[in-house]
Amino acid sequence: MLTCAEPLISPSQIDLRVGHILYCKPHPNADSLFVSTIAMGDDPSSSVITPHAELDLPAEVLAKYSPLPTVRTVCSGLNGLVPLAEMQDRKVVVVANLKPVTMRGIKSAAMVLAASPKAPAGEEASHKKEFVELVSPPEGAQAGDKVFFEGYEGTPEAQLNPKKKVFEQIQPGFKTTADQTVAFDRAQAGWVGEGEKGKVAGEAVARLVTKAGGVCKAPTLKDANIS
């Protein structure tokens, strides 16, 4: 009896896009969280967008972005790490096909990528982050533009199945290089030797780029983790 083999794990399965934060505020129920309203090029029929009638945006924001594009509500654990002022009216890179989760009463429908220094030798990787930078798409990139790791082009999954832990097998390879470029590093992800089984072939270190060739970067952090 023939059985269908599981598809190879690939960074192309992750829906990475340019997002535009229209407005951000502290989460009312969690001191470590921000709640952002982010445009990322969604179709109006998408089940993950926030209906305009449910938005609570200041009048000046509504006036600035009239007509208001489709948006998602996104919670991020960046409060206390990134100044609130830096979370307003700016382009970011988002993971757009994670299963939405409710964070302290607010449904979050994407994840904002940020760089943080690697833990010093001898310390746990989960050490407290004291300095975080948002990943910046290249100048001129627009909300909804697809970004991908060079050599790993493909069609993302509509929604990643959390039971298969696809993102968890890929994200550990996200990093910045010596020139702050965001990249996927196979070795850092453990995709070498026995770890290559079930993984697609590709570049050892692949930059995160737009179709136009622009590169996504962190402002200053080199050899940093991306999450």
Please annotate each region the language model reported:
Residues 1-227:
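Phosphate-backbone binding interfaces of nucleic-acid-interacting proteins
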